[in-house]
Regions:
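Small-residue-rich anion-binding loops in enzyme active sites
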Residues: 1-13, 110-115
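Iron-sulfur-associated redox domains of electron-transfer enzymes in respiratory
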Residues: 66-178
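N-terminal basic/disordered segments at the start of proteins
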Residues: 5-23, 95
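Short, charged amphipathic alpha-helical surface segments
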Residues: 47-48
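A short, structure-level motif marking secondary-structure boundaries and short turns
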Residues: 5-8, 40-41, 80-82
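Iron-sulfur cluster-binding cysteine motifs and their immediate structural context
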Residues: 1-2, 20-43, 53-71
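Conserved SAM-binding loop
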Residues: 17, 51, 160-161
Length: 178
């Protein structure tokens, strides 16, 4: 335990619920708890926390995001109208995911559970792709997806991750690629 407990946010509603702090904590001092509205926030166990600051370093909200200048911009849509109709992005995610899966990679994205919660899952078969298609207008649980992504990348697999900007930035920070 540390004399100075780490506080990630002054107001819990500043948190985007990406779970990066929980997944990076080597002491398992952080758990994500849900409020009455279903939003997830980190709770730090001061008995387990050693004050290393890993959670602060990986946080995409409490750190400045380096903005990059956009390069060339492309617009596209999937030619198959059935697939593009099931997608929110004109089918581009489906096209990219299909290619990654065909080449033996793994795809991560948000899917509804049987309880109609939304969580990030991984798929390895094209027939599972419809679960990831379409927008989900609620916060998704990341579970241990960042840990699995890191493991898959270390094993040399191609990984496609589809998420909202704060999740993508948190993943980059978690992987040390900011």
């Amino acid at each position: 335990m540390t004399d100075k407990a780490i506080q990630l946010f002054k107001n819990k509603y500043q948190c985007c619920g990406c779970n990066a702090c929980e997944m990076v904590c080597g002491k398992k001092a952080i758990t994500m708890i849900e409020d009455e509205y279903g939003f997830r926030f980190p709770q730090i166990d001061t008995e387990k926390c050693v004050g290393c600051g890993s959670c602060q370093k990986v946080c995409c909200i409490n750190n400045d995001v380096e903005l990059c200048k956009p390069g060339t911009v492309y617009a596209a849509s999937y030619k198959n109208k059935d697939i593009s109709a099931k997608s929110a992005s004109g089918g581009i995610f489906a096209a990219l995911a299909k290619q990654v899966l065909t080449e033996g990679g793994i795809v991560f994205g948000s899917a509804y559970t049987k309880q109609f919660d939304v969580e990030v899952i991984s798929i390895e078969k094209i027939e599972d792709l419809p679960r990831l298609q379409g927008s989900k207008y609620v916060q998704s649980s990341m579970n241990s997806s960042f840990l699995k992504i890191k493991s898959e990348l270390q094993a040399g697999r191609t990984v496609l991750f589809c998420g909202v900007p704060c999740q993508v930035e948190a993943l980059k920070r978690f992987l040390g690629r900011s």
